């Protein structure tokens, strides 16, 4: 009887255990968690090679049993193959695995990884469950197996890339391969850089020289390119930071901006969104990586330069306009500058609508303006702000049928109207050349700029060539804006004055040298002022001295505008050079001349409907104030008769066609003019 009872008991125990053991067969094992730089890195051993979905849970108390999952937070899910570096494996044609830790061992094909970004400070525990394809989630929890037993302290911080390996890319150049796992949550230190968590994005670092030769170049690839493209810009010993604008679907890339919150990164069938919001995920990731590189490598943060062709050129233009405080200067070749303008372009709206929606809808973004305004460089160039815009050296082709030529005209107009400076070259080239100029020969121009040194933004030079109307048959076939005038790099930037030596400049083409003009006028706006700090509304004095004979040929007063800009218009530049001095009234050794002409200021350089115009009259006599188009035709008169002091005028352009317009003020034989751009 005893033996019979024992046998029955064994059968009963096996009957109870077998279903339990079978249920546990889907449980992951070896769960490990490490927290650093605001992210928790979870790895585990998988129950099988393929066909699994994993769910990641967290709680502030230990997860010991299935019932504990009820109160736990589901932070994410992932599928098979997270151990495998799909991007690099495809690029190199061989299998690569991720490493969780810098210089740590690569994961094996029986492991998985998930990276969770912390959104609060505190202690956490984690558990991971598995679900086989066609089955249900196995919610078994075994402490120390698929649930962490060790208390983990998490804190909010900016995520950092993890070093993976060294790769030889070209000519014995060694690129340090890093991976930044994405976050879809905004924190105080870093905005979301994807709409999914734990997606691996590559970046690369090519180590360069120590100080003082520690220049950093930001290398942005063209559409369809990759982070392994790290061509040297000036020297093979330059530091280089590469990025990867990569979408694992037919849309290829986000044009260095981002995509809709509901966009599926791995789908080829994304529908065009009609509602919701577009976010600058890629832009946020790029800015974060620039900050990481300048903080963690021995590079000079004052000498960071962006460089790129095609979509890589677009990267530079929009970086200069939106994050100009992070880059000293930008070199851009054949860039797309308006993602809503496809005139004379092989690109077309349907290529981008799954990411951004249709231009007619113009969905909102997380950056304060509709998406197609944010992706229009002319709009960004016209934004009135104290925010720094980096200088741009740009090349465009009038016969470029990939990105199109017509889009450049409103952008050029906005840059000039808002006195942003930079140089804009063009010739008759297509997207890949050849043309009448050598774009590569201008790369060296960006090296004169530093983030910690003032420079003069030159605009509206009288010797500018004519880019035309956007029709490739109109305007000059080869030309440039503001390339016919130059300055001496020894700029005076003191507490009481700012000075620069201006001089005419010759233009190099493939057919020879275009001689420098013997005389020109140009608008000058000091940028990145270090010591000559002035406040809006301050009245300053200026003089222009002809260097050939030392004569002060012209001078006057200029008012600091609401955005702290000092804009001196129509400065004469002579063959032997002109020294422009801007200073506080009453500086020792400098006279205090009376105002010689009216002062004009407008609250925005690009006007959509209305603008506020300010005028300061130098005397008390008869005065005129009128609006003109580019042909010189007077459209409206705001003032005719005696005037004195200061006045504000509301300028309504709602019924005016888009284009460039001038306001001219005259009194006592002296006049001043101001130009702005109208867009609708």
What positions do the PLM features span?
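Pro/Thr/Ser/Gly-rich low-complexity, intrinsically disordered linker/stalk tracts
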Residues: 24-52, 135-163
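Recognizes extended acidic, P/S/T-rich segments that occur
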Residues: 55-122, 134
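Alpha/beta-hydrolase-fold serine-hydrolase catalytic core, especially in secreted/extracellular enzymes
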Residues: 166, 170-172, 176, 417-579
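Short beta-strand element of the alpha/beta-hydrolase
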Residues: 213-223, 231
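Alpha/beta-hydrolase active-site loop
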Residues: 267-298
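The feature captures the conserved acid-bearing segment of alpha/beta-hydrolase catalytic domains
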Residues: 338-445, 449
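Residue-level detector of functionally pivotal "anchor" positions at catalytic/ligand-binding pockets or at interdomain
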Residues: 584-614, 618, 679
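C-terminal tail/sorting-segment detector
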Residues: 611-613, 637, 642, 650, ...
């Amino acid at each position: 009887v005893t033996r019979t009872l024992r046998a029955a008991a064994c059968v009963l125990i096996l009957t109870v255990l077998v279903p339990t053991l079978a249920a546990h067969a889907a449980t992951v094992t070896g769960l490990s968690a490490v927290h650093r730089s605001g992210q928790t890195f979870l790895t585990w051993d998988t129950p099988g090679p393929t066909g699994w979905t994993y769910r990641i849970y967290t709680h502030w108390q230990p997860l010991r049993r299935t019932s504990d999952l009820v109160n736990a937070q589901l932070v994410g899910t992932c599928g098979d193959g997270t151990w495998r570096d799909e991007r690099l494996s495809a690029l190199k044609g061989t299998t690569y695995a991720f490493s969780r830790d810098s210089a740590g061992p690569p994961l094996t094909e029986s492991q998985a990884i998930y990276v969770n970004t912390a959104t609060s400070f505190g202690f956490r525990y984690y558990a991971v469950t598995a679900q086989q394809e066609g089955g249900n989630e196995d919610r078994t929890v075994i402490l120390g197996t698929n649930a962490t037993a060790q208390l983990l302290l998490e804190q909010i911080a900016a995520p950092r890339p993890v070093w993976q390996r060294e790769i030889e890319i070209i000519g014995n150049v060694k690129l340090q391969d890093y991976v930044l796992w994405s976050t879809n949550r905004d924190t105080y230190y870093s905005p979301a850089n994807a709409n999914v968590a734990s997606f691996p994005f590559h970046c690369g670092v090519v180590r360069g020289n120590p100080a003082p030769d520690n220049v950093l170049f930001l290398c942005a690839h063209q559409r369809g390119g990759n982070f392994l493209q790290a061509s040297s810009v000036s020297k093979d010993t330059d530091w280089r930071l590469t990025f990867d604008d990569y979408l694992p679907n037919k849309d290829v890339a986000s044009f260095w901006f981002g995509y809709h919150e509901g966009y599926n990164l791995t789908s080829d069938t994304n529908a065009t969104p009609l509602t919701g919001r577009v976010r600058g995920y890629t832009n946020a990731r790029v800015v974060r990586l620039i900050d990481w590189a300048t903080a963690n490598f021995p590079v000079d943060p004052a000498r960071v330069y962006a460089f790129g062709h095609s979509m890589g050129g677009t990267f530079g233009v929009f970086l200069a306009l939106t994050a100009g405080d992070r880059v000293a200067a930008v070199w851009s070749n054949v860039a797309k500058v308006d993602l809503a303008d496809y005139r004379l372009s092989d690109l077309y709206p349907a290529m981008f609508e799954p990411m951004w929606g249709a231009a007619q809808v113009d969905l909102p973004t997380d950056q304060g303006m509709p998406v197609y305004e944010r992706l229009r460089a002319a709009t960004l160039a016209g934004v009135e702000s104290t925010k720094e815009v980096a200088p741009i050296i740009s090349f465009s082709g009038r016969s470029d049928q990939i990105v199109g030529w017509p889009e450049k005209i409103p952008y050029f107009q906005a840059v000039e109207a808002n006195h942003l400076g930079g140089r804009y070259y063009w010739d008759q080239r297509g997207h890949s050349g050849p043309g009448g100029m050598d774009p590569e020969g201008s790369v060296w121009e960006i090296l004169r700029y530093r983030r910690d040194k003032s420079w003069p933004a030159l605009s509206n030079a009288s010797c500018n060539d004519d880019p035309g109307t956007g029709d490739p048959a109109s305007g000059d076939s080869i030309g440039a804006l503001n390339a016919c005038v130059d300055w001496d790099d020894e700029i005076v930037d003191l507490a009481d004055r700012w000075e620069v030596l201006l001089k005419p400049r010759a233009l190099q083409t493939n057919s020879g040298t275009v001689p420098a003009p013997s005389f020109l006028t140009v608008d000058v706006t000091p940028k990145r002022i270090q010591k000559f700090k002035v406040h809006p509304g301050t009245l300053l004095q200026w003089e222009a001295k002809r260097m050939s004979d030392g004569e002060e040929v012209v001078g006057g007063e200029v008012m600091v505008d609401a955005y702290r800009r000092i804009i001196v218009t129509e400065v004469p530049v002579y063959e032997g050079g002109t020294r422009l001095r801007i200073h506080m009234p009453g500086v020792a050794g400098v006279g205090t001349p009376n105002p010689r002409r009216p002062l004009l200021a407008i609250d925005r350089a690009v006007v959509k409907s209305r603008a506020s115009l300010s005028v300061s009259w130098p005397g008390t006599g008869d005065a005129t104030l009128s609006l003109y188009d580019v042909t010189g035709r007077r459209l409206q008169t705001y003032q005719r008769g005696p005037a004195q002091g200061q006045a504000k005028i509301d300028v309504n352009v709602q019924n005016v066609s888009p284009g460039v317009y001038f306001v001219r003020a005259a009194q006592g034989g002296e006049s001043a003019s101001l130009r702005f751009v109208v867009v609708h």
